[in-house]
Amino acid sequence: MNKNIFITLLISSLLLLSGCTGDTCIDPDDFGFIKFNVSSRYNPEEITSRQEGDQVAPWRDSAYKVNGYPLTVMVRPWSYILGDKNTSGQLSAWCPWYGQKNNTTTLAAFCVKLQPCTFWDNARLDMCTPNPANQNDAMISNPPCIMTDGVGLYFLIAAKNTDPNISPDSQRKPQGITQHLGELTSSVGYEFYSISSTGQFLPAGGINYQYKGEDKSKYAQSPLYFKIIDKFYDDNSGQYRLVIKSGVTDTRPDPLQFLTDLIKGVLFGKDGIIKKTYQQIIDTPGYRMSVSAILTLYIMFTGFSFLIGNINLTHVELIVRILKVSIVSILLSTDKAWTFFHDYLFVFFIDGVQQILQIINEAAATGPGSQSLLGLLISPQTLSKLFSLLFVDWLGFIYIILYLIALYFIFFLIFKATIIYLTALITIGMIIIMGPIFICFMLFNITRSLFENWLRQLISYALQPIILFAGIAFISMIIRTEIYSTLGFGVCKHDFPNLGPINEIFGSFLEDIDPSLGNSIFYWWFPVPMKGGINNFHKAKILVPEDHIIVDDSCKNDPDKCKHCAAYECIDERYIELPFLDLVKDAKRISNFINGKFVQLDGILLIFVSIYLLSKFNDTAISTAQFIAGTSGNLTDIQKVNQQSYESAAKQMNRPLSYVAKTVSVPVTTRVSAKLEETSMFFAKGFEDIMMGRLEKQALGSSANKAVQNEVKRKYGIDSKDVKMNAITDYENGISGLLKNLPKGNELKAKELSQMKFTQLRDKIAANKYGVKDYAALSEEQKRELDKSLKDANLRELASDANFTKDYQDAYKYAHQEMSGRGVGLFGKNIKPLRSWQEMEHRVDTKRKLKEERRVGIGEKLYAGYTGIKRGALTAIVGKDLRDAYEGNLTSAEWHDFEYNDPRLRTYSEKLKDDEKAREREELQMHINKETLAAQADILSPEYLARLEKAGRQSDVEYYQELAQRKLIHEVRGRLFEEGEPVMMGDRFMREKATDSQMRDMIDNAHRKHAEFIEGDRYTRRQEHYDIMHEKAEGNLEQTYKELKDHFKRDDINIEEMPALIAQKIKDTEQGPEVDAKITEELNNFNADVKNYEYSTEVLNKIEDRKQAITDEVNAQIDQINKYRENAKMEKYVRPIVNEGRKLRKLEDHLRGMK
């Protein structure tokens, strides 16, 4: 069921995403274009006026930078006559004749119905160009009119390191490339076409600018600006809607790229972990001393070998040795070490890899849309076209399902590739951290292989992402081509039902929010044209929207001479409705579209084949990189030189070198390992915090796992139905309301206070309101006043509910982790048969493990007993002192001597006994789990025991209480003996070694741990909840009893007759037709109070029994310590702990006491 819900939510989210395009219609080549609006109006403070009618306005920054490819910008068409609306979401025209301040995105009413401007001889070239010498006005033949198709709009590719808005002169004559977007594209041999809001293909304005000569590299990564140029802006109205189809670097966020940049910043940023750790290593005095020693030895051995003639020191060899000494010497310069090695070595493995991957990704982006394949597949435009197939072809549903399946696999394959890349990135960082150690190893032959292996690993992990993403890019190109060919048609929204007159009232407002909400909140996408037929398709010369190769007669025999065209670089004749399909090569697909067959199943088949290839390539990329790096030869031999053998000198060299290598590696490697562990813990802790936070939210949400909830109910006794999911928020809101009435309430934060218990909260509020230390320091009058404020705010009950909800969240997390620890994975938590099988496997493995441990323990116990007999006999013969002197050779002393690595300093035989108790605890827990599973409830919880006792199952209560007592003893002892500050050390240590102060500290520690155990026990923590329930029920019953007593003038009323007396009292005091309803309501309230009183009384008594059991066990350990003190002739220290609990009376006894 949960799986079906997940699939439903996934499809629903994709459907929702498909409606987030913000457009009424989507062009055939739109798979996620960058859209930008340019207004014809400016704020008065932005405009500079030199003289009347000569205003200069700033250029609008698009926030994008050009990338050197053809810059293609289209201006949306707009026609009021054809049905387009004068709204911010549809308007793409401006009027230079009339406008007001509020006409930044709409036309003035005067201009709406004006005709588009026409020009004498279509001369638009010299119209208001950004040139001070040009004073010409546009040669308009039909004023007044509106400007459309980009007339008057210019783009600016600003020169690098320049700001076109720094001064009025730079605004008028900026440095860079400026072009007018309103020129007739037909003059250059092509046309722009776009689908209007009414679903018609209309000619559009725009420009396709292709760089000349060196401009491509000169202006790469330069900012792009736009501006409507006019001489007087104050009377303008309207805007242009632009679509940037190509030529800019897409800076829109990609989730996986964001994750990569985040981790890279943490590791390799300016203050990254890698740099800090690297500098800490080279700053270590011991490391610097070791490097100095290595250099000294290397120079000494080089001189010695040259003097005795063992090496032929040629010019090349001398240069090589000097370079080695120079490189290693840099490690001694802490200021320059990181800068040198990062800028000349490590940068190739960090930024170099990133640049290569960027080049690969750009090469793989063969058309419009996101550079990321995943971004293309889930873009709103792509999904809108995909879901439009549902009602135009009976195969549409099948295609959509197959597409979603393919999307699922592609997501996980790309995610896997990203994880491989991040792993390689982190590993490169770790290898770089170890660089100061391994760079020193390049000096000597005996350690050179270590340096070579270090460098090979660095190269291997740098190659892995390159090879991996090169393969992904290749497969991505195939998938992109199929997506473009299959879904490269236009779509429009069709509303149902149309709101008609209502739209006239609310349509403009809704369109200002989202242009897609103009007519109805219900809609669906349909292809344009929706029907087949050759008359619905039109040919024209257009810019080809994807990378392709032009094959003509000049290159048929030599394919290398064929021209490669980038997207929107070359012109071809194609159907404007199917711009990605070549008229010759794709004739079959074009025929299918014309005949109304929009679904191309052969395309989805090719996508699945590509996914299979991608999965295989992911598995081989790492081994390929390792193969290349492992067979690249000796990477450190700059040039081979002749060396004579000097075996005798080499043998003498190896001794000090081995010592020096060990001296360098041990302390530094230890520090590096610590830093690496710290780094890994940083990511592990962050991931764990995210997962725990997710589980906490899941526990209180509708997506909570039913299997985990049942586990919580069985093992922790908390039913999710009893949990108030908004209790934490209600508690925080209640505190906020109380703080508003405090004179210094603004000094406290409600969120921090909501994490406290009620008593701690009361102390804080007392200190804030009255300036005292805590609640106990208040006078009686102040206490009554504060208690009334807290009671009016109902904070005690809210705090109890919030703590109960937090306990449930913790139990949910623990149950989820416990199920995972037992081998119950994600599918097991949702599929009951699989979960049962996994649980059974875990129980079998646990029993097998315990059986094996018991068998080993029995053997060790027998041997320990045998050695104990020998030890006792030796003591009787030679005495204790002589035994201790010779015990190691006679009686296996390791069984009876202290384990100094043990925090409790036990002997091995004592540890065996404790291990046996630990096995008993595990066996007991398995038995309790079995009983819990059978009862489908937490058999140890006070609530369950109270219900059993109420049902008269006293034998079961006694049995479960005996199990609870045994488990509680194990838990208390485990808490007392845990590492850190154990309450009890080993028996031999306590008898022979423990001092007076040590034993006093142990007893003090026992008192502290007793309080912590009571405070943290999951059963005793519920006392406040049932205290409130008991007090409410008790108060209501006392009030009812008093009213009956006063009404009937009786002192001998018992509980059994109270319902009849309540009914009689209402009949005596009330009249009218509502008497019966009143009687029913009062009796229901009385019965509920009786039930709550009796239930809470039983539960609270069980909780008190548990607290007393905890106290008794802690006292038993304190008594044992005092026995050791008595045997050592020490005085008894402090009295045992006393549990100050109370036993509540039954309801009959309580009412009897009121008479």
UniProtKB/Swiss-Prot annotation:
GO cellular component: plasma membrane
Database matches in Pfam families: TrbL
GO biological process, one term: protein secretion by the type IV secretion system
Lipid attachment residues per UniProt (S-diacylglycerol cysteine): C20
Stretches that traverse the bilayer: 291-311, 395-415, 424-444, 459-479
InterPro entries (alphabetical): Conjugal_tfr_TrbL/VirB6
Domain of life, source organism: Bacteria
Lipid sites, type N-palmitoyl cysteine: C20
Membrane topology recorded in Swiss-Prot or TrEMBL: Multi-pass membrane protein; Lipid-anchor
Subcellular location: Cell membrane
Signal peptide: 1-19
Entry keyword set: Cell membrane, Lipoprotein, Membrane, Palmitate, Signal, Transmembrane, Transmembrane helix
Family per record: Belongs to the TrbL/VirB6 family.
Protein name per Swiss-Prot or TrEMBL: Uncharacterized lipoprotein RF_0093
Organism: Rickettsia felis (strain ATCC VR-1525 / URRWXCal2)
